[in-house]
Amino acid sequence: MKRALALGFLFAFLPAAHADLAAGKRKAEACAACHGADGNAAIPQFPVLAGQTARYLYLQLKDFKEGRRSEPAMAPMVTKLSTQDMLDLAEYFAAQKPKPIAFKADAARVARGRKKADEVLCTMCHLGGFSGQNEIPRVAGQRPEYVIKQLKAFKARTRTNDAGSMTSVAQTISERDIEDLAHYISSLD
């Protein structure tokens, strides 16, 4: 019995199928209105998915589907996605190249944001250049509006699908820090 439970637990975290990029591209057509056909969102409130880590994308889709992460625009999009669909979409968007965003960062805010990022040790998880790894997102080059929205959600504890790490960090930063961090992160590519 214990062995069966252990094996069941192990296999619950392993995707059963391999991702299909061509299928992901076809499925991504439904995502284009908000995220762009290639994952380079033109709408400031939506994240750039291009170049994001596949593991992170898969987990976010799963969290949206299972109600651990909430976003009204995403709810109807994920309800019918299968595990295979989520794997295909995650791999497709991860394989795309992020394009520089049209954003003129304020130099003073970038400097303050860099200092705050060092203080709260952002690169311990997000890595140098904020490139992300595995289930930690690539945040470099995200639009400032999206970065601000997410940091505020972590601070308000309305986004909690992070195992507590971002929620804890967000409690230590001010509204000004959030704006400064957004300028810094959005200035990276």
Spans of features found by a protein language model:
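Sequence/structural segment immediately N-terminal to covalent heme-attachment motifs in c-type
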Residues: 20-38, 101, 105-128, 143
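C-terminal capping alpha-helices of c-type cytochrome domains
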Residues: 79-101, 145, 171-189
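Sec-dependent N-terminal signal peptides
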Residues: 4-13
